[in-house]
Amino acid sequence: MSALNLTVRVHPVVLFQVVDAYERRNADSHRVIGTLLGSVDKGVVEVTNCFCVPHKEHDDQVEAELSYALDMYDLNRKVNPNESVVGWWATGNDVTNHSSVIHEYYARECNNPVHLTVDTSLQGGRMGLRAYVCIQLGVPGGKSGCMFTPIPVELTSYEPETFGLKLLQKTVGVSPAHRPKTVPPMLDLAQISEASQKLQQLLDLILKYVDDVIAHKVTPDNAVGRQLLDLIHSVPHMTHEQFTQMFNANVRNLLLVITLSQLIKTQLQLNEKLTFLPSA
């Protein structure tokens, strides 16, 4: 498959690690680089992890601690054997003169390595994210070169990462003085209530879109229509009585789990107090 047909999907933990490495950089370092880890499947490069590689850039050369990079990769393989090298990342918004030298090293580590640039300066209030592949150029018998060509890049996340991002969004507008140091887990019933409210808001948004399309206020989108049709077909067909019975059964199971968890919590607290009770 051609490198130009690749699509890069980046997980949020990668961006957090890049920002953390940039904040911890040396005072004389203007750019931070590192290795991208993940997997490649059917033209999709999924970046799930990364680590920083210490380096120094001079006018005519680049010095990188390759032994450190190999040690970090070996350690990561022991924990995540499914992750392999898929490319490298760098802070900044542009490809520099030294990028081709660094990319040449990663081309020996994997096929079609991708280069990810992360704009940590937050120009325009956003973190710019770009992905490139290196395309070889030249004529037969002449000098050859390479050109960094942009490829599509998008953000993706697993379900636990999505919950973590939602929790971060809740505290992003809170001042540090009033921000709690610890966030207790939300009760199960409260989570169901919050999820139901969000589902109701999304349903209202969909109904408004459908009404606007019927009233010719909005131009219909075939892609949205197909997604809505697939959504309707995915809903199981059942009567009102069947749905009520199933819902009540799930609520009873949830209440039973909550009761058992509270009993276990009380038992553990009682056991802790009895353990540290001074003997007579």
UniProtKB/Swiss-Prot annotation:
PROSITE patterns: MPN
Biological process according to GO: antibacterial innate immune response; defense response to Gram-negative bacterium; formation of cytoplasmic translation initiation complex; positive regulation of Notch signaling pathway; positive regulation of peptidoglycan recognition protein signaling pathway
GO molecular function: metal-dependent deubiquitinase activity; translation initiation factor activity; translation initiation factor binding
UniProt key word Disulfide bond: no
CDD domains: MPN_eIF3f
Domain of life, per lineage: Eukaryota
Pfam families according to UniProt: JAB (PF01398), MitMem_reg (PF13012)
Keywords for the protein's UniProt record, in alphabetical order: Cytoplasm, Initiation factor, Protein biosynthesis
PANTHER family found in the cross-reference section: EUKARYOTIC TRANSLATION INITIATION FACTOR 3 SUBUNIT F, EUKARYOTIC TRANSLATION INITIATION FACTOR 3 SUBUNIT F-RELATED
Family assignment from sequence similarity: Belongs to the eIF-3 subunit F family.
Name assigned to this protein: Eukaryotic translation initiation factor 3 subunit F-1
Organism: Drosophila ananassae
